[in-house]
Amino acid sequence: MALLQISEPGQSPDPHQRRVAIGIDLGTTHSLVAAVRNGVAECLPDAQGRVLLPSVVRYLGGGGRQIGYEAAAAQMQDPANTVSSVKRFMGRGLGDITGREKLPYDFIAAADSGGMLSLSTAAGVKSPVEVSAEILATLRYRAEDSFDSDLYGAVITVPAYFDDAQRQATKDAAHLAGLNLLRLINEPTAAAIAYGLDNGAEGVYAVYDLGGGTFDISVLRLAQGVFEVIATGGDSALGGDDYDAALAEWVMQQTGVRASTPEDKTSVRLAARACKEALTATDNVAFTADVAGATVQFDVKREDFAAVTAELTQRSLAAVRRTLRDAQIERDEVKGVVLVGGSTRMPVVRAAVAEFFGREPLTNLNPDEVVAIGAAIQANQLAGNDAAGDLLLLDVIPLSLGIETMGGLVERIIGRNETIPTAKAQDFTTYKDGQTALAIHVVQGERDLVQDCRSLARFELRGIPPMAAGAARIRVTFTVDADGLLSVAAREQASGVEARIDVKPSYGLSDEQIARMLQEGFATAQQDMQTRALVEARVDADRLLIATQSALDVDGDVLAAAERTAIDDLMHALRATLETSTDAAAVEAAAQALAKGTEAFAAQRMNRGIRQALAGKNVSAL
């Protein structure tokens, strides 16, 4: 008789079977895939022994495509169909891309994309999600060939600043590439894991991540295997590409040469990148580029490069200062600084970071590989291969989330820099008598007025039982999952009617917009407080006028003529103040006058209600 084999829930029937899980760093300039093999995390090479995959895809006529090194080599002769730095376009609309005129691509807003941009290529219209999926699929095939096995799943890293739309676009790309996505984790968290900071490390660490397209700074607190991201910051207009552009522009000014065609611009940009990389190892390099049919040559010294790019380096340190201030951490409290991203190889950057923090940064791991290695370690644990090494990762929300309330005010539900995953709820009520539906507008930002924040989603809760204004209790719950994606639910407590929405905006906030919104929030805090006070006073006054008029319509006959006239005059005065005054105190004073002037009326209404309730009843019945 055969026996049924029953394994522990969630475990493989074969205790010796190991699931293959990978970590992927989907980067702006290069992408990598890593995995844990024989207990050691390592980046997986291609057939030629190269671990870096250029994040470049070239589309050919007839549906063909080239990916990686082959595509990168074609940038000079076919820039319009060779897509690089696609990470900058993920989850974004046409209006979000600055300097479009300097890029060789034909951007369009596809009719079925919900506002997300696409690119017109020789192989048809391609979205950034599709381009990223080509890169992810190439890395997936590399991993499958390396292990000669199917993959259990993947952890993919994203910048800490990525918003809902950008994270969702990354998840969509993973799905399109045939990957089982185990988790999205923030790049600085992955870097900290790679450095082994989970192995008993305690204290505050900073992760300085200067990649090809963006700069991110994160402050983490480590305690007994718990990774808590205290604060994040950055600058989306700052990366290795911007150092290249600054050097290229300076050389063009020095030589008097102008690059006008897409081919010339690409030639100058690639020459600047090669010059920058060479200056990492030597003090003097010849800048060489073909422009307008002629060869341009110019000697560049390391000190020239440092002077030309000094403003960019200082911008990164300004973002570091803001983030430390958000975290309420002094720079001397930082126990260690982790460098991430190929651009941190620049001596000028390393020297500036060391001077700022007063300590040499951690550089013993390859800055190009550190994020992928950390993702691989996390993937290995999520696959159940290293149960003893479980980590608790606490990432944060970059901007506050809330809903619109009466008067166009924002009521924050989840605050900026709160750890995720999280769920928070708050009760709201109706504004008018008999209201049976509630419109819920979800917004993101630090300002007090809806018009100054970013709209994320709208939905309606219908079927609310008719009640007096303020009687209904609607609980609104915000839930942010471990990938940083938001869902919102609204439930009327008495009837149980419920509505919910997964917030998937067609495109979202750029890092630059997040930084700008934070700066505006700080700069206008006093003004916002005054505006909010005025709006709240006006909403309260309107509610008082509605309630008073409703009471007069029902029980106005209990008033003497003089009493009715006095109340009418107070109501008229309050309406006049609402129409003419922008002073919250004046509105509050007029509303208080009406409230005080109707106290006797309220007492008379209560007496009438009591008499009506007692009518026809004797003492024994009571």
Curated annotation (Swiss-Prot):
Keyword ATP-binding listed: yes
Molecular-function annotations in GO: ATP binding; ATP hydrolysis activity; ATP-dependent protein folding chaperone; unfolded protein binding
NCBIfam families reported in the protein's UniProt record: HscA, PRK05183.1
Organism: Acidovorax ebreus (strain TPSY) (Diaphorobacter sp. (strain TPSY))
Family: Belongs to the heat shock protein 70 family.
Gene, per the UniProt record: hscA
Entries under InterPro entries matching the protein: ATPase_NBD, Heat_shock_70_CS, HSP70_C_sf, HSP70_peptide-bd_sf, Hsp_70_fam, ISC_FeS_clus_asmbl_HscA
Keywords, alphabetical: ATP-binding, Chaperone, Nucleotide-binding
Protein's job: Chaperone involved in the maturation of iron-sulfur cluster-containing proteins. Has a low intrinsic ATPase activity which is markedly stimulated by HscB.
Pfam families according to UniProt: HSP70
Name of the protein in its database record: Chaperone protein HscA homolog
